[in-house]
Amino acid sequence: MYSLEEFNNQAINADFQRNNMFSCVFATTPSTKSSSLISSISNFSYNNLGLNSDWLGLTQGDINQGITTLITAGTQKLIRKSGVSKYLIGAMSQRTVQSLLGSFTVGTYLIDFFNMAYNSSGLMIYSVKMPENRLSYETDWNYNSPNIRITGRELDPLVISFRMDSEACNYRAMQDWVNSVQDPVTGLRALPQDVEADIQVNLHSRNGLPHTAVMFTMHSISVSAPELSYDGDNQITTFDVTFAYRVMQAGAVDRQRALEWLESAAINGIQSVLGNSGGVTGLSNSLSRLSRLGGTAGSISNINTMTGIVNSQSKILGAI
């Protein structure tokens, strides 16, 4: 038992699991219908990245070659040094993105379903309703004492709530995924291995490392209708996707391996960003201006300079 003082001093940052420290990952992907569409949209997506011709060290040929099949359109494939690729579709902060993708330069980009890169930590998924692990039973009263008989297992759906992006890419992808399960025109149903995927829901600790992983083998069965209104006070459009699963497994992530991976991937990534000359870590010229190690004078002068620029622009805009 903790006393109140011990709780405040020692366990304030590691007390209980917070409901917003989670992330969702496509561990495996369905492999139908997307291959026929990838070739037609990969060049278009590359031209609309909004960056120069060399994006994160990838050329147009590399992007076309690195496209894989995911839900009718695919995502851009992230290959870590370990060779494991995952598809991040939602995370709370950059710490969770860093713990999953293992690179500061790439991990800050949320990979969308249609090869479009977003320079953010990713907030497309804002809620996950985990299903219950529940057995069906009935009570037999034919004996002196009631006897409980297990009749089977009840599988509740997995419900993931999305924020619709500015071009509704995730909404269209989920709609087509449901149509891939059963064609709305012909009524033909796809094979399970062609439309099933594994969604992994990770629980993260306060330092960003995942400690629990829940894996679902499932496919989407419904996409809710977003509510559109002129009286909505400019709210963000949201929709829910319901997944039916066959298998749900929960397991712990080995902490020692997570720490070893963090040391090899994250810390080395930080050193590569900050620069390491002759074994001594030092800031580069561009990053040294952002450091607080040089005192507060430089930061205050930079803030004052920026404030003056903003004030000048505000006066001009006000005059117009």
Swiss-Prot record:
The keyword Transport does not apply. The keyword Hydrolase does not apply. Induction: Expressed in the late phase of the viral replicative cycle. GO terms for biological process: viral tail assembly. It is found in: Virion. Keywords: Late protein, Viral baseplate protein, Viral release from host cell, Viral tail assembly, Viral tail protein, Virion. It comes from the Viruses. One of its GO terms (cellular component) is virus tail, baseplate. Baseplate protein that forms, together with gp48, the baseplate-tail tube junction. The tail tube first 2 annuli are formed by gp48 and gp54, which are in continuation of the spike complex. Involved in the tail assembly. Morphogenesis of the baseplate is completed by association of gp48 and gp54, which bind the upper part of the baseplate dome to form the platform for polymerization of the tail tube. Homohexamer. The tube second annulus is composed of a gp54 hexameric ring. Interacts with the tail tube protein gp19. Interacts with the first layer of sheath proteins gp18. Part of the baseplate macromolecular complex which consists of gp5, gp5.4, gp27 (central spike complex); gp6, gp25, gp53 (inner baseplate); gp7, gp8 (intermediate baseplate); gp9, gp10, gp11, gp12 (peripheral); gp48 and gp54 (proximal region of the tail tube). This is Baseplate tail-tube junction protein gp54. The gene is 54.
